Regions:
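Class II aminoacyl-tRNA synthetase catalytic cores and aaRS-like
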Residues: 35-639
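Cysteine-centered motifs
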Residues: 2-4, 11
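Short, Lys/Arg-enriched N-terminal segments with co-localized hydrophobic residues
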Residues: 13-39
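Serine residues within intrinsically disordered or low-complexity segments
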Residues: 6-8, 18
């Protein structure tokens, strides 16, 4: 049979062969097909896909169907060819058998290789062999009557399969292949479902979806903006939005009452495991509301979202916890509540003891706190030393410990500095029992919180205490209004300059006691991850002026950066509040992934570059000239 190409496919013309299978000096057909691998593409003219691969079931037995997709696997058993065809819905098996399948089709099917794009027309039949319970189409197979190779493929640099062990750098370079993997496709389809449900829910709640500008005014406060040079205004730049914050507040001034947007945002900052230079927010703002109103609508949203997407019931109301309580109990403002191991403040217990590390920290205004790792009293010293090195990354000078043996005796790094009664009181305060390991940090509160909070999570990972099938939400409220910057030597806004202080703390703002002022701010935390945050906004001129003054803004500076917003506030501004979710992080947790890169189609790596497109790249000289820009050579970084 001849396989020369035409618009309708291979012509199938019969060619005479000699006994040894050769014709015109050519190798036998089977050998030529194996060598050429059908690199010619055929048209799909006249064909229409009737079903996706994973949609077929026993209910379709006897039907003639047309499927299209990628070859996942081809198994040639010599006269019996099994082809697994894959699309985003799943996999279905096509069976070609000598004597039952036309010889040209059998030969053609035998030549297929992984990732060829194919179209099969055939009849759905019950499987002649064992049922495959691993796939949804495991009861059936397709007996083909027609095959077209729509596109051939080179051998891919890695196998397209679930939970690939290929290095991430390779997968990101060939992201278009990586995205064919079923697990990544499920992630992105879940993300699409989340966005659809989000729009539906908030539309039913009376929210209006409004787009805000991508090209806005750059502001020097906070994270660095991505700058976009203006060709028509030489020397001037737009800033890509870090959030739609100012615009959504203006929309409240405009009377839109309830705003929602799935917004693209940009931040030019050093990347961490849960950060990307461009990301997506579910952004909202509401007028004539307070904290409870924002929390109420968002609890109902989360309950609906998790029920619809994951069939998980979210218990309402969601637990609330003040920032101070979260820090004292968990050493973190985004606590993971799936396990215990809470911090215990033993400052008063060890005050005046003989251990200088403890008493020195207390005398310097710090605290002593500990965690009880239940059942870990037998942990080897080398492992404890590794934990000590771990907390040093968070500013701690060391880690003191008490290992309670099964017989009740203790091994401790500081027992010789304390009396028996002091040690017994400390163990009692920590609720220590035989077999427990007690770990302590002594320093300024922030260092103790940060180090023990991180240690708590690290131990939970090592001890496998984290259940990915459990979803524990908590609202964190009453954040500090300001945080001290050692680098800048001044107070900065913990959230942004437009966050409303707690009414009862306004006198503290007046007196300049900024470290004591609490904000009407709130975060929603899931399994130790902040998935959203927001606040009630300032809508009163006098309080806004005091905020700017506290942050070190002159009136001229405030007007230069935020003049358009302040001007709008002069024409009547309603009390308003809002919240924004990090969509990527939310979906990451729902999909039980470890990185937001696995829920973003084309993510960047840690240096904010794209391995696939090689962005960013130098601009063309002509482009720079049009923009009135000149690039200065940067000094090479030291090795």
């Amino acid at each position: 049979f001849c396989y020369c190409r035409s618009l309708s496919g291979f012509c199938g013309k019969i060619i005479e062969y000699s006994e040894n299978g050769e014709q015109g000096g050519q190798a036998p057909l089977q050998k030529r097909l194996r060598k050429e691998r059908y690199t010619m593409a055929e048209s799909m003219q006249g064909l229409k896909r009737t079903h996706r691969c994973g949609e077929l079931s026993a209910a379709n037995v006897g039907e003639t169907v047309t499927i299209m997709g990628w070859v996942q696997k081809n198994r040639n058993k010599g006269g019996l060819v099994f082809v697994d065809v894959r699309d985003r819905s799943g996999i279905v098996q096509v069976v070609c058998e000598e004597g039952k399948t036309d010889a040209p089709l059998l030969e053609k099917a035998a030549s297929l290789r992984s990732e060829y794009v194919v179209a099969f027309v055939g009849t759905v039949a019950k499987r002649s062999g064992a049922v495959n319970d691993k796939i949804t189409t495991g009861e059936i197979e397709i007996i083909p009557s027609e095959l077209r190779i729509l596109s051939s493929a080179l051998t891919p640099p890695f196998q397209v399969e679930e939970n690939s062990k290929t290095k991430e750098e390779v997968r990101l370079k060939y992201r278009y292949l990586d995205l064919r993997r079923p697990d990544l496709q499920r992630n992105l389809m879940m993300k699409s479902q989340v966005m659809t449900l989000t729009r539906q829910f908030f539309a039913e709640e009376g929210f209006i979806e409004i787009e805000t500008p991508m090209l806005g005014k750059t502001t020097p406060e906070g994270a660095r903006d991505y700058l976009v040079p203006s060709r028509v205004h030489p020397g001037s730049f737009y800033g890509l939005p870090q959030s739609p914050q100012l615009y959504k507040q203006l929309l409240m001034c405009s009377g839109f009452d309830r705003y929602i947007q799935i917004a693209r945002c940009f931040r030019d900052e050093d990347l961490r495991a849960d950060r990307q230079p461009e990301f997506t927010q579910i952004d909202m703002e509401l007028s004539f509301v307070d904290v409870d109103d924002v929390i109420d609508v968002n609890e109902r949203y989360l309950a609906k979202l998790f029920k619809e997407v994951l069939d998980v019931d979210v218990q309402l109301p969601i637990q609330r916890m003040t920032w101070q309580e979260a820090m004292d109990r968990f050493g973190s403002d985004k606590p993971d509540l799936r396990f215990g191991m809470e911090l215990t403040d033993v400052t008063d217990v060890v005050r005046g003891c003989g251990f200088g590390v403890f008493t020195g920290a207390i005398e310097n205004g710090g605290s002593v706190r500990g965690i009880n790792a239940k059942g870990q009293g037998g942990m080897p010293r080398k492992k404890i030393d590794k934990l000590t090195a771990f907390v040093k990354d968070y500013g701690a000078k060391g880690l003191a410990y008490i290992a309670i043996q099964e017989d009740g005796t203790v091994k401790s790094s500081f027992a010789k500095f304390m009396g028996e009664e002091e040690m017994a009181d400390l163990v009692s305060a920590m609720k220590g029992e035989p077999g427990d390991l007690l770990l302590f940090a002594a320093d300024q509160n922030k260092v103790v919180w940060d180090s023990l909070g991180a240690l708590r999570v690290e131990l939970a990972k090592q001890l496998e205490l984290l259940d990915k099938n459990e979803y524990r939400f908590v609202w964190i409220t009453e954040f500090p209004q300001f945080e001290w910057s050692e680098e800048q030597g001044r107070y900065l806004a913990m959230h942004h300059p437009f966050t409303m202080p707690m009414e009862e703390d306004l006198p503290l703002l007046e007196k300049g006691e900024l470290g004591k002022v609490r904000a009407k701010a709130y975060d929603i935390v899931l399994n130790g991850n902040e998935i959203g945050g927001g606040s009630v906004r300032i809508h009163m001129d006098d309080i806004q002026e005091k905020m700017f003054e506290a942050l070190g803004f002159t009136k001229e500076q405030a007007r230069s950066q935020f003049g358009f917003l302040l001007e709008a506030f002069k024409y009547g501004v309603p009390p308003h509040a809002g919240l924004a979710y990090g969509l990527d992080r939310l979906v990451m947790l729902m999909a039980k992934q470890d990185s937001i890169r696995d829920v973003i189609a084309f993510p960047k790596i840690k240096d904010a570059s794209c391995l696939m497109t090689e962005a960013p790249t130098p601009a063309d000289e002509k482009q720079l000239e049009e923009l009135g820009l000149e690039v200065k050579a940067q000094p090479e970084k030291a090795e």
